[in-house]
C-alpha cells in the first residue's frame, strides 16, 4: 500500500464515448468533416496507458500530443503501432533537436504537425526542414481573447503563456508565403484553459478561433485541421456547477455539440470548407480509469474526560491566580444558566490563563492537564466537543495527491469495504510523512471531514479507502517525497467471459 488499480476497459469506454459524442454531433448537424482526437501524454505518461490509448483509438485515427522531446520520443514509438492517419501534435518549446525529431517522424511516415508556440520557431522549422529535405506540416497556436476566470484559465486570453497574437500570425503567414511553404500551414490550435465551466464560454472561444481559421484559408494557407485543445471538464464533486473549479455543467455530448455547432456556423457563413476537428482531451479520457487505494493504519482516540471530584476541583481552583479563578466562577455560572456560547468563551480564557501560569512556573503539568480536562469535560457536557478524529493513512499526499496539496483540488474519497455498515465516526486524513501539509481536510460537498468507520472492528482490523478520478496528472506530478517510493500498480481487464477479469 498504497496501490493504484487501473482499469483499461474504462479507458476504452471513455475514448469511445468521446468519439461517439462527436460522431453524433457531426451527423446530426450535417458537418462535412470528421473528428479525430489526440491524447496529451503529459496527463499520464505511463507506457501502458499511452499504448492502450493508441490501441483503443486506432479505429478512430486517435493520435498523441507531445510537449517535450522525451514525450515526443514516447509518442513516436507508440504511434508506430497505431493508425497511419493519427496526428502527432508537437507542442511546447522547440529547439533544433525537437524540430529535427518531429521531421524524422514524418520521414517515418508518422503524421507529425509542428505547432508554432513562438514566432521565432518558424525560422528553425524552415531551415531544418530544408536541410533534411522534409516538407513539414505546420500548425500555429493562436492567442485568443476569449478566456475563463477560474483557476485553470490563466493560460488563456491575451496575456496567456502560449500562442501567437494576430500580428504575429500575419507575420508567420507572410514569411511562409515568401518561403514557398504557405501550403504547409495546415492546423490552427488554441486552448481556452482546462475545466471549461460552460458550453457558452466554449462556443465563444471556438467561434473566435474558427474566424481566425477562415482568415488563414482566405490568405492562402493549406488549412485542414482546427485543434480546440483541452478543456473538456470533469465533474469531480457531482454538483454540475459552472461556478466551481472542480465541476462543469455539461455532458460530453453537449460539449461536442457546442464545438461542432460553433465551427459549422462560422464556416458556413464564410462559405468555407469544414475542417477536421481535433481535441486534446486528456483529463476527460484518463481521470476515471484508475483508483488509488490506501490503508488507514490508525486513528486518534477520543479521550473521554470524567467530571472531576468536588474535593479535587476545589484544591485545583485554589492554586489558580485571581483572574483564572474568576474565569472558572464565570464558567460555572454560565453552565448553570445554559449559556453555552458564554461557556466556551470563559473556557478558552481559563485555559489561556493557566498556560501563562504554567509558563511562569506557578502551575505544574499535572495541574495544567487537570484544567484541560475540566474544559474538555465542559465542552462534551454541552455538546460542542470536536468529534473529528485523525486517521493516519499509508501514503504521501505529496506523491499520490499533489494537486490537493498544490491548489486544493478535490477528489472523491470513500471507504471501499464495510459498505454494509453505517459509518459512526467523522475523520480527516493524515499521511505518514513528516510534513504538516501532509493531510486531507477538505472533501467533496464543502465538507471538512469524512464519515468513516471505527478501525479494528472488522476485516482483521484493516481499513481501506479509495480515491477516485485521479488518473490524470496525479501520477505524472508525484515525486518521491520522504523517499516513500511510488505506489504499486495493478491492471484489471475484463477477459472473454462477461464476469471474468484478469
UniProtKB/Swiss-Prot annotation:
UniProt keyword Magnesium, yes or no: yes
Residue positions, PTM N6-(pyridoxal phosphate)lysine: 42
Origin: domain of life: Eukaryota
CDD domains: PLPDE_III_ADC
EC assignment: 4.1.1.19
InterPro entries recorded: Ala_racemase/Decarboxylase_C, Arg_decrbxlase, De-COase2_CS, De-COase2_N, De-COase2_pyr-phos_BS, Orn/DAP/Arg_de-COase, PLP-binding_barrel
Cysteine disulfide partners in this protein: none
Catalytic activity: L-arginine + H(+) = agmatine + CO2
An annotated Gene Ontology molecular function: arginine decarboxylase activity
The entry's keywords: Decarboxylase, Lyase, Magnesium, Putrescine biosynthesis, Pyridoxal phosphate, Spermidine biosynthesis
Pathway, per record: Amine and polyamine biosynthesis; agmatine biosynthesis; agmatine from L-arginine: step 1/1
Cell division in keyword set: no
GO BP field: arginine catabolic process; putrescine biosynthetic process; spermidine biosynthetic process
Stated family: Belongs to the Orn/Lys/Arg decarboxylase class-II family. SpeA subfamily.
Protein's recorded name: Arginine decarboxylase
Organism, as annotated: Solanum lycopersicum
Amino acid at each position: 500500500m498504497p496501490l493504484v488499480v487501473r482499469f483499461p476497459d474504462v479507458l476504452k469506454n471513455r475514448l469511445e464515448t468521446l468519439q461517439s459524442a462527436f460522431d453524433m454531433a457531426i451527423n446530426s448537424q450535417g458537418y462535412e468533416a470528421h473528428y479525430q482526437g489526440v491524447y496529451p501524454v503529459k496527463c499520464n505518461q505511463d507506457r501502458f496507458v499511452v499504448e492502450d490509448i493508441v490501441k483503443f483509438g486506432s479505429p478512430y485515427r486517435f493520435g498523441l500530443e507531445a510537449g517535450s522531446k522525451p514525450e515526443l520520443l514516447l509518442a513516436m514509438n507508440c504511434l508506430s503501432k497505431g493508425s497511419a492517419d493519427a496526428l502527432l501534435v508537437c507542442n511546447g518549446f522547440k529547439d533544433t533537436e525537437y524540430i529535427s525529431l518531429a521531421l524524422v517522424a514524418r520521414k517515418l511516415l508518422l503524421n507529425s504537425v509542428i505547432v508554432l508556440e513562438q514566432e521565432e520557431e518558424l525560422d528553425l522549422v524552415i531551415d531544418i526542414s530544408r536541410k533534411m529535405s522534409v516538407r513539414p506540416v505546420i500548425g500555429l497556436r493562436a492567442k485568443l481573447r476569449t478566456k475563463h476566470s477560474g483557476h485553470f484559465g490563466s493560460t488563456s486570453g491575451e496575456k496567456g503563456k502560449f500562442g501567437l497574437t494576430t500580428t504575429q500570425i500575419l507575420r508567420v503567414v507572410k514569411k511562409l508565403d515568401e518561403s514557398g511553404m504557405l501550403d504547409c500551414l495546415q492546423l490552427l490550435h488554441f486552448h481556452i484553459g482546462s475545466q471549461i465551466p460552460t458550453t457558452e464560454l466554449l462556443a465563444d472561444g471556438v467561434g473566435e478561433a474558427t474566424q481566425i481559421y477562415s482568415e488563414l484559408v482566405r490568405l492562402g494557407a493549406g488549412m485542414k485541421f482546427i485543434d480546440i485543445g483541452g478543456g473538456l471538464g470533469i465533474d469531480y464533486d457531482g454538483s454540475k456547477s459552472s461556478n466551481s473549479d472542480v465541476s462543469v455543467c455539461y455532458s460530453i455530448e453537449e460539449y461536442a455539440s457546442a464545438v461542432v455547432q460553433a465551427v459549422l456556423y462560422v464556416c458556413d457563413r464564410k462559405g468555407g470548407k469544414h475542417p477536421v476537428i481535433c481535441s486534446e482531451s486528456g483529463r476527460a479520457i484518463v481521470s476515471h480509469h484508475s483508483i488509488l487505494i490506501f490503508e488507514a493504519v490508525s486513528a486518534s482516540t477520543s479521550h473521554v474526560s470524567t467530571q472531576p471530584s468536588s474535593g479535587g476541583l476545589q484544591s485545583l481552583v485554589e492554586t489558580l491566580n485571581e483572574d483564572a479563578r474568576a474565569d472558572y466562577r464565570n464558567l460555572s455560572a454560565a453552565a448553570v444558566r445554559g449559556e453555552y456560547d458564554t461557556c466556551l468563551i470563559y473556557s478558552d480564557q481559563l485555559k489561556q490563563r493557566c498556560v501563562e501560569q504554567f509558563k511562569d512556573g506557578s502551575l505544574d503539568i499535572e495541574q495544567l492537564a487537570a484544567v484541560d480536562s475540566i474544559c474538555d469535560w465542559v465542552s462534551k457536557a454541552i455538546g460542542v466537543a470536536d468529534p473529528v478524529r485523525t486517521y493516519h493513512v499509508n501514503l504521501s499526499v505529496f506523491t499520490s495527491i499533489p494537486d490537493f496539496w498544490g491548489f486544493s483540488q478535490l477528489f472523491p474519497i470513500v471507504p471501499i469495504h464495510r459498505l454494509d455498515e453505517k459509518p459512526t465516526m467523522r475523520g480527516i486524513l493524515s499521511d505518514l510523512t513528516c510534513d504538516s501539509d501532509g493531510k486531507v481536510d477538505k472533501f467533496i460537498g464543502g465538507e471538512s471531514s469524512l464519515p468513516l468507520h471505527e478501525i479494528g472492528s472488522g476485516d482483521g482490523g484493516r481499513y481501506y479507502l479509495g480515491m477516485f478520478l485521479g488518473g490524470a496528472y496525479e501520477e505524472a506530478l508525484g515525486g518521491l517525497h520522504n523517499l516513500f517510493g511510488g505506489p504499486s500498480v495493478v491492471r484489471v481487464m475484463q477477459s472473454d467471459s462477461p464476469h471474468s477479469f484478469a
